[in-house]
A protein has these predicted regions:
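Non-catalytic beta/alpha edge segments that cap or flank active sites
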Residues: 1-164
Length: 164
């Protein structure tokens, strides 16, 4: 199943045009063989704007998978996880745990990531880190399971037992 993906970059400087967005395009490049990229955008680190965008993308059934990049660290302006939790219906902690475990294998700073993964309606929303390198590392570890999760959300896959 080729799923529909929305990519939202969270960055004050990129939203003002002061710095190019490198992580959003990195996500798009990795997912293009597996997914139709149906929407991309850049927003500043603003909790309400992020939550409103995620809510709209999920509620209007625009994307099966919504990936954010940026705003998951400890900076006072990093609010992506909080915005995501504002609109969450279900938590999917294993995705964020897997990403942190992979990041910590590479650097102890991986434990400082606060990204979350949630479900709203029939959309799976995942917060990725802000650097292209970390995006690649995290997506590489979660991509094998994402298709099954999305198929389950969409009502295609019903069996969640281990398949190998």
């Amino acid at each position: 199943m080729k799923f529909r993906t929305a990519v939202l970059t969270i960055s004050d400087s990129s939203s003002r045009g002061e710095r190019p967005d490198l992580s959003g395009p990195a996500i798009t490049q990795m997912l293009t063989p597996l997914s139709d990229i149906v929407w991309t955008g850049i927003l500043p680190d603003d909790r309400e704007q992020i939550a409103a965008c995620l809510r709209r993308l999920a509620d209007e059934n625009q994307a099966d998978l919504i990936l954010t990049t940026g705003g998951t660290g400890l900076s006072p302006r990093d609010v992506t996880p909080e915005a995501t939790l504002l609109i969450a219906e279900k938590m999917v902690p294993g995705i964020a745990e897997a990403m942190r475990a992979e990041s910590m294998r590479i650097t102890s700073r991986g434990m400082l990531s606060r990204g979350v993964a949630v479900v709203r309606g029939r959309s799976l929303i995942v917060n990725l880190p802000g650097s292209p390198k970390a995006v690649h590392e995290c997506l590489s570890v979660i991509l094998p399971a994402l298709s099954h999760g999305i198929e389950t959300l969409c009502g295609i896959a019903r069996e969640c037992a281990a398949q190998g």
